[in-house]
Amino acid sequence: MEKPIRKLPRMKGFDYSQEDAYFVTICSYENKHIFGKISKINGVNNFLPSRIGEIVQDTFFRLPERFSEFELIHFSLLPNHLHFLVLKKDIDIQRKSSLSQFVGAFKSLSDRAVRNEMSIIKIWQKSFNDHIIRNEKDLQTHWLYIEENVNRWGEDEYFL
């Protein structure tokens, strides 16, 4: 039996180390709700992070210390996935990183930090989804999507 042809997650031929803005989604392993929960407070959905979620957030916000060419624009963590907007700047540094290296380092560092505190083997699915931001309107659309994500939690494709 032939193996199915796997769709490549990155755009073929695109240089992910060049200056650009990206919208990224990363899911938890097996889409488990391990990062926290959504709770209604005064009729409004709020995300309440678990200890794993706190570690993930802390790791994420410390990433620019390692990757000075990446600027975090917006971020939203939900029970089983996260979305973020990031700008890859073209600055003069010796070691230039791609979006995949940035995301890979984040997943590895957060995974290790979680394992140091608890006996969870895996917190992330393989790979990640990305969208290359094409213009200001596209950036605003994805910014708003992240901003309103917690309010749409019950309708979210990752709600499962």
Model region roles, listed by residue range:
Residues 1-160:
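Short catalytic/metal-binding and nucleic-acid-binding patches
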